Amino acid sequence: MANITAKLVKDLRDKTGAGMMDCKKALNETDGNVEKALEWLRKKGIASAEKKSGRVAAEGSIGSYIHTGSRVGVLLELNCETDFVARGDIFQSLLKDVSMQVAACPNVEYVSIDEIPEDVVKKEKGIEMGRDDLSGKPENIKEKIVEGRIAKRLNELVLLSQPYIKDSSLTVEDLVKQAAAKIGENIKVRRFTRYTLGEGIEKNEMDFADEVASLKSN
């Protein structure tokens, strides 16, 4: 495996405008070949999408999705730059796909890593630091293990980090970037709400004999 240096990642980022993590992933996937990494980013729609990410996305649409059986529902706000794009097929298809993703991921609570409150991060770190399998390990080793576990746990809570349900080689973030590259506008998932039928309601469980007895007493 090629040695992916910080300079190599920076050079690719300067050429593409893509994020550091995307550049590093592209170089890992292409054994450190910059030209192939550039092609990889373009195929993913990342190279051109990143250049648009700083532009204001104040238009868009709120989509809804009701899963089969009507037991799970989702409302999701997806933003873009113009109303024209918001009404287009690519944008509306993305809105539906991301809404379906939320319905399929009951553990997801946040759009991106940046949204996770610091107290949640501290809580997860406290849980991991206290695990029995870390006892007796040197502090520096323990920190590295915990860091990896926390990153994995936090990504489980984030919508953009989820493997896309229709193609697990992509994340939801990849999907959004691909759509942005096709459309030529910045696209942002702003917020979502997931509803589960009966969630939070305490059910009064009663067996058949008790139910019959209660009916007789009325």
From Swiss-Prot:
Residue segments, region Involved in Mg(2+) ion dislocation from EF-Tu: 82-85
InterPro entries for the chain: EF-Ts_dimer_sf, Transl_elong_EFTs/EF1B, Transl_elong_EFTs/EF1B_dimer, Transl_elong_Ts_CS, UBA-like_sf
One GO MF term attached to the UniProt entry: translation elongation factor activity
Compartments it resides in: Cytoplasm
PROSITE patterns linked: EF_TS_1, EF_TS_2
One GO cellular component, as annotated: cytoplasm
Keyword Glycosyltransferase: no
Keyword annotations of the record: Cytoplasm, Elongation factor, Protein biosynthesis
Pfam families given in the database record: EF_TS
The keyword Cytoplasm is assigned to this record: yes
Protein origin, superkingdom: Bacteria
Cystine connections: none
PANTHER family per UniProt: ELONGATION FACTOR TS, POLYPROTEIN OF EF-TS, CHLOROPLASTIC
UniProt family annotation: Belongs to the EF-Ts family.
Function: Associates with the EF-Tu.GDP complex and induces the exchange of GDP to GTP. It remains bound to the aminoacyl-tRNA.EF-Tu.GTP complex up to the GTP hydrolysis stage on the ribosome.
Record protein name field: Elongation factor Ts
Species the sequence originates in: Prochlorococcus marinus (strain MIT 9515)
Gene from which the chain derives: tsf
